[in-house]
Amino acid sequence: MPKIYQYLNFSIYIYTNDHLPLHVHIFIQDRQVKAELLWVKNELKILFKKVSRYNALTSAECKEVAIFVKQYEKKIKEKWDKIMYYNQPVKAEVIKKKI
């Protein structure tokens, strides 16, 4: 499960051999959500889902992550494709500045 981003205190991962739709797993402390990236009429929609065995992120945290995901959607998709379709390693990027 490669980490693709460290954004502020959020760790963002893509699990290898995972399933569609394109999604990322976001951790902060001992909490996690899954963020599905869906394109409806060429507009990105982000659907946050609770992951079993984990407490979810707060709504404020999800809003912060949504801003990041919208800003980095193309890079996230590129990393998804490299991991899922080409079995290529990706480097985790660290973003310390709030978007």
Where are the model-predicted features located?
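Acidic, low-complexity intrinsically disordered segments
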Residues: 53-99
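Negatively charged, low-complexity tracts enriched in Asp/Glu with abundant Ser/Thr
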Residues: 1-12
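Generic preference for hydrophobic/aromatic residues in regular secondary structure cores
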Residues: 4, 43-51, 72, 76
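Aromatic side chains
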Residues: 10-15, 80
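A short, structured beta-strand/loop element
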Residues: 15-16, 20-59
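General "foldedness" signal
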Residues: 1, 24-28, 38-40, 49-51, ...
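Residue-identity detector for glutamine
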Residues: 6, 29-32, 71, 88
